[in-house]
Amino acid sequence: MASNTIAQSPSGAIHVPIDQGYEGWTEKFSRKFKENPWVPIGCVATCGALIMSAVKMRAGKSTDMNYWLRARVVIQGVTIAALVAGSMSLQAQRKKVEEATGVTEETKKEREKEEFESRLRGAQAAYEEEAALAGKTVKGPTVKRHVHPETGAQEREEETVERKAATLAGRQHPHPVAPVDKKPQEG
């Protein structure tokens, strides 16, 4: 699946690049654990304290239950502090990496603008090509009306691109000429 290369900055912080493709939950967990290991450890400790308080409550030991509930609150607070500190250090680390590689917001915006303009030029060229081809194609069927020489009934024939191609190839088109209900006008 995704292969992440872990880089360590001079400050000692670990930088794990994020792939643009699909990242499964195991890869995401391992990446997040490597970025900030205190958060998952704190979550496990919080769950452990909550389970211990439930066990003590079932045993009828209310003082021990209160101890584990207070421990859960403290551990949860430490976990949240680790989460905030980790996100702040990651933000500072990413800023350092951007400065080191020279990729800043301005260069990102310029690159996106250039990519957009190149796609726009390609779309305009395709539009002009389609417009040039549209002038050379047949636009819809042409209708011919004529009077049948023997019966005098007026008939109509639609010439479509398929019918013209079939006529040129010497075949008969699968749809015959459709008669029109109007009688010939004399005059």
Curated annotation (Swiss-Prot):
Disordered, as annotated region: 133-187
Record's bilayer topology term: Multi-pass membrane protein
Membrane-spanning segments: 38-55, 68-90
GO process annotations (BP): mitochondrial respirasome assembly
Coiled coil: 95-132
Assigned keywords, A-Z: Coiled coil, Membrane, Mitochondrion, Transmembrane, Transmembrane helix
UniProt subcellular location: Mitochondrion membrane
Recorded GO CC terms: mitochondrial membrane
Signal peptide: none
Any one Pfam family match given in the protein's UniProt record, by short name: HIG_1_N
Keyword DNA-binding on entry: no
Gene3D superfamilies (alphabetical): 6.10.140.1320
Domain HIG1: 10-101
Complexes and interactors: Associates with the respiratory chain complex III/complex IV supercomplex.
Protein family: Belongs to the RCF1 family.
Role description: Cytochrome c oxidase subunit which plays a role in assembly of respiratory supercomplexes.
Protein name: Respiratory supercomplex factor 1, mitochondrial
Species, as recorded: Laccaria bicolor (strain S238N-H82 / ATCC MYA-4686)
Gene: RCF1
